[in-house]
Amino acid sequence: MHEIITLQLGQRANYLATHFWNLQESYFTYNEEEESPVDHDVHFRPGVGADGSETYTPRTVIYDLKGGFGTLRKYNALYELTEDATPGQGLWDGREVLQQQAPIPQSDYQKSLDAGLPAPTLSAETVRYWSDYNRLFYHPRSIVQLNDYELNSKIMPFEDWTIGEELFNELDKEHDLLDRDVRPFAEECDQLRALQVFTGSDDAWGGFAAKYIDRIRDEYGKKSVWVWAIENGKKVDRQTQFKRDLNKARSVHAISTQASLYAPIIDPPSRIPQSIYLDARSEWYTSALVSAAMESVSLPTRLRPYHDFEASLAGDDGTHKIFELQSTMVQDGEDAANSPIKTEFDLDFTYDGLACKNSHHVFNQLQVSRGLADGGGESGGEDQGILRRKRHFNSEPMFQRFHTTLPFPILDSFPQNMFPELKSKEKINILAALTVSSRTAERLKVYETLAGRVAGVDERETLVNGLGEIRETYETGWMSDSDFDDD
């Protein structure tokens, strides 16, 4: 087995990850059904419930602030034994005054799941928390509430990157988070393959993630670390945007050099095709759109047979870690793969349609097509080492395509009206990609300039120089007149 442990850091990360886990649960097959092409052991762990029954729960650790879990409890029906509702007073003989916060009422969707009834159609109005559309049970160890900060607090907002750093340091000093939260899951693995991290990157969760991943690298140095770094795409005032951009710059600087994959994700992107309906005010909607691309492009990591996803990410030189996430929804019968390297997609989650001042160069592209006719990939007839040297000599990009006939399922936990023009309402075909290109250098240059103007004196030089060093790897090693641009 090649297991993956997931970390979910913060509210936006949990909105996206909940869609991800609902999709994984939908791939299970039962009884006489044909075996699923998805290997569930990659992301799920066997266990035993409170009543002795066998369980199968996600191998994940979910962090959120106080009030962020909604109706999700640490102990659910799988792990909860009936407790005495009127416990004794113990040694205290005085009068007790018990103060409890009013419980959040369960959503109709969750009530229907518990009762085994058909689920009602969800809407932006009925989804209040990410737990409102969650379809899975989690192990109690997976639920970690951080009580130091409260969700959406105006008094102590969890927004500044350094606050996240400080919170991690305090908690890690007191509890050793890696030992308490990650190690129990890691020790259950036969062959731990990677750690997958969903995190916000333009708020305090970026600082929290940076410190966490630094610890992960110390402990699991040879394992892959895949980071889905979520940025708030909603319009805000100029001052707030400066703060967010500085947080992004800090996250790229601190995390991308430690990660095997660092994919900045704008949630939501501003450029939405007319064929897609999106309620940009709803995180349930926007994270659903992201999940269609993110879950599709990472699908090879859990398909049978084993795919060497890491080698495809590494490219020819292993120096590029910042990837662009892109996708296109494809109608039945469409040929989505006329040419191997694609530079234009319907949805660009990383640079939101940013065009370089000059034509941009693609260093590496990994495509995943699902539900489509297999257009084939790079020829396997020639030795891969020779192909790699040829590409390097000719400044050509590395290209890899994975294909599966498994379409993207439209679950009842997913917005039902997001793809109104597609023929099928139950499944869609998707072409998704992770791309390394010189557009990253353009964005890093913007961050360098911002850091030079806005960052504090104590971090300015380190941040500007560090971003400059990363930027150079996306500018060198290719010829500007390469054929692989967006002509």
Curated annotation (Swiss-Prot):
Cystines in this chain: none
GO cellular component: mitochondrion
Coiled coil: none
Gene Ontology BP annotations: mitochondrion organization
Subcellular compartments: Mitochondrion
Keywords: Mitochondrion
InterPro entries from the UniProt entry: DML1/Misato (IPR049942), DML1/Misato_tubulin (IPR029209), Misato_II_tubulin-like (IPR019605), Tubulin/FtsZ_GTPase_sf (IPR036525)
A Pfam family per the record: Tubulin_3
Keyword Mitochondrion set for record: yes
Function as written in the Swiss-Prot or TrEMBL entry: Involved in the partitioning of the mitochondrial organelle and mitochondrial DNA (mtDNA) inheritance.
Family membership noted in the UniProt record: Belongs to the misato family.
Protein name: Protein dml1
Gene: dml1
